[in-house]
């Protein structure tokens, strides 16, 4: 019954999410002539890493015969067989524990959660087993495992399927936490995560899966890998710094376009990596623009934005010409109704208003 309810939630979201894709990304991402969807980027990254390393395998609910709830694992069962693509029961605690045990033994599991909301069923294994083992063993045990799946709000799937867990996992020593925006991000970061010797929480976004992005020839090479812990400046500017991650990068780029029409030059930083956090890039940008706006979908208290603001105040306070501006989701469980859901999430106009406040522009 639980599986049926989960699938209905996914199917119900599909009718709404198409209307939101247009708002997600600005097309100024890369200079490449080719395009690739985030879904295909993730699929190709897993495929190439499985082909290159026989220790890599995939496990999760419906990742095999159904090819994944979002088709990220399409074609992998046929290519690699059931020995390396494991369909699991609906028991996150069970299969996550098996994955961590396999990583202890030197294998490289890629564990899929149908949504990161369900990772709460397995949080003991993620934090107490995966994240702490290297420290508790004095470096003798590595846990090369990737926990991946959609994170944050989708479209009308309710409070129990819409939460952002970036701040939760980013607070834990021993974990690395990545959040891709584009196809290039998805390919490069997932390949880096699979190759990493430590546990990585890989936070995707359902509304980005079907979105196409320009992608360079370099990113299409099987050796392509992005560095963990390094942010990307998506758009350069001189008046205000906007820092965000995942789907909100697209919103920030749209806001930057609107701000440019009013004579405000916004620099947009795509974090890519939540932990480790690229404080150097953030602070260097703020020291140039003297203003900071942070954006995230998560709850406002104790969030990723709060950590970024604290870092800037600690390291670049004397460079600030205005108070830092923090934009986050509403401090409530996610509403189901579409109109209330929109009010609970940051919007492009929110970023524009906050940026103008930082620049002391009232209109």
Swiss-Prot record:
Q: Name one GO molecular function term.
A: metal ion binding
Q: Where in the cell is it found?
A: Mitochondrion matrix
Q: What's the Enzyme Commission number for this chain? A: 1.2.4.1
| SUPFAM superfamilies with a match to the protein in the record | Thiamin diphosphate-binding fold (THDP-binding) (SSF52518), TK C-terminal domain-like (SSF52922)
Q: Which residues does thiamine diphosphate bind? A: 92
Which EC class does it fall in?
A: oxidoreductase
User: Binding residues for K(+), per the UniProt record?
Assistant: 145, 193-194, 196
Reaction catalysed by this enzyme = N(6)-[(R)-lipoyl]-L-lysyl-[protein] + pyruvate + H(+) = N(6)-[(R)-S(8)-acetyldihydrolipoyl]-L-lysyl-[protein] + CO2
Cross-referenced PANTHER family: DEHYDROGENASE RELATED, PYRUVATE DEHYDROGENASE E1 COMPONENT SUBUNIT BETA-1, MITOCHONDRIAL
Q: Which residues form the signal peptide?
A: none
Gene Ontology cellular-component terms for this entry are: mitochondrial matrix; mitochondrion; nucleolus; plant-type vacuole; plastid
* GO biological process annotation, one example: pyruvate decarboxylation to acetyl-CoA
- Please name one Pfam family that this protein belongs to: Transket_pyr
CDD domains according to UniProt: TPP_PYR_E1-PDHc-beta_like
What does the record say about tissue specificity? Expressed in roots, immature rosettes, and mature rosettes.
Q: What does this protein need as cofactor? A: thiamine diphosphate
Which superkingdom? Answer: Eukaryota
Query: Quaternary structure per UniProt?
Result: Tetramer of 2 alpha and 2 beta subunits.
Q: Which organism is it from?
A: Arabidopsis thaliana
**What name has this protein been given in UniProt?**
Pyruvate dehydrogenase E1 component subunit beta-1, mitochondrial
Keywords, comma-separated and alphabetical: Isopeptide bond, Metal-binding, Mitochondrion, Oxidoreductase, Potassium, Pyruvate, Thiamine pyrophosphate, Transit peptide, Ubl conjugation
